[in-house]
Regions:
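Positively charged, amphipathic and often flexible ligand-engagement surfaces
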Residues: 1-151
Length: 151
């Protein structure tokens, strides 16, 4: 399973309306985060039955994942657990996970521009609102550029 937060909100709302059931979208970010972390915990406790792709740009969820894996004695290289971020976003998370030996992938959406652009805009908007991570990520990118120039 691939777990993500907020990636399919419009589709889920439309589907719920079409099928006549209440929207499954959480009322606020705190509830969304709690749901994400609960799903993460459940899946990591049931890896014999489920594999997981943890699609997150959220540092706290990444730390929670790493802590749970350690507590449950799940090896960093276990092929049933992968982390992923959108190409060009949260590179500091991807780099540090890979540096520590975790399975990491960058994903790159593709398809017709009319389908891909709204998705990318949503991702960018969501990531600028993640507790000031955008300015922090920019400073990390500048530091990395400086490091590369000096080597």
């Amino acid at each position: 399973y691939k777990i993500v937060r907020g990636a399919y909100m419009e589709k889920e709302r439309e589907r719920a309306k079409e099928k006549g059931y209440p929207s499954p979208i959480c009322k606020d970010k705190a509830t969304t985060d709690a749901n994400f972390n609960d799903c993460l915990t459940y899946i990591l406790h049931h890896l014999n039955d489920i594999s997981i792709f943890i699609g997150t740009h959220n540092e706290l969820s990444t730390y929670i994942s790493m802590e749970l894996m350690q507590q449950l004695n799940i090896d960093k290289t276990d092929n049933r657990v992968w982390f992923g971020q959108l190409y060009g976003m949260s590179d500091h998370i991807s780099f540090n996970l890979a540096e520590q030996g975790y399975n990491v992938a960058k994903y790159l959406p593709f398809g017709p521009v009319k389908d891909v652009m709204p998705y990318l805009i949503r991702r960018a908007e969501e990531n600028t609102s993640v507790a000031g991570q955008t300015s922090r990520e920019l400073s990390l990118l500048k530091a990395e550029r400086k490091r590369r120039k000096s080597n």
